[in-house]
């Protein structure tokens, strides 16, 4: 096994596909879960308070 640049040429498969619910290209093909909206993991849309801008 070699590390580094020769190993990077073997990465040809797609990891993420287009999500049916949010439309972003963040649906993991192997786990069948969207990292953007949480599709496949939860019925609710994925949203957190730390994503929003703080109001003073």
From Swiss-Prot:
Task: Report what the protein is called.
Answer: Large ribosomal subunit protein eL37
**Per UniProt, where does Zn(2+) bind?**
19, 22, 34, 37
Kindly state which keywords UniProt assigns to this record, in alphabetical order.
Metal-binding, Ribonucleoprotein, Ribosomal protein, RNA-binding, rRNA-binding, Zinc, Zinc-finger
NCBIfam families reported for this sequence: PRK04179.1
In terms of PROSITE patterns, this protein maps to: RIBOSOMAL_L37E
Q: Which cofactor does it need?
A: Zn(2+)
Q: Which GO terms describe its molecular function?
A: rRNA binding; structural constituent of ribosome; zinc ion binding
Q: Where are the zinc fingers (C4-type)?
A: 19-37
Note whether Zinc occurs among the keywords.
yes
**Annotated InterPro entries:** Ribosomal_eL37 (IPR001569), Ribosomal_eL37/eL43 (IPR011331), Ribosomal_eL37_CS (IPR018267), Ribosomal_zn-bd (IPR011332)
An example Gene Ontology CC term for this record = cytosolic large ribosomal subunit
- Which family does the record claim for this protein? Belongs to the eukaryotic ribosomal protein eL37 family.
Q: Does the keyword rRNA-binding apply?
A: yes
Q: Paste the cofactor note.
A: Binds 1 zinc ion per subunit.
Q: A Gene Ontology biological process annotation?
A: translation
Q: What is the name of the gene encoding this protein?
A: rpl37e
Q: What does the function comment of this entry state?
A: Binds to the 23S rRNA.
């Amino acid at each position: 096994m070699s590390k580094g640049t020769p190993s990077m040429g073997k990465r040809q498969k797609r990891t993420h596909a287009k999500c049916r619910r949010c439309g972003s290209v963040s649906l993991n093909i192997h786990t069948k879960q969207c990292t953007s909206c949480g599709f496949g993991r939860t019925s609710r849309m994925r949203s957190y308070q730390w994503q929003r801008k703080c109001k003073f």
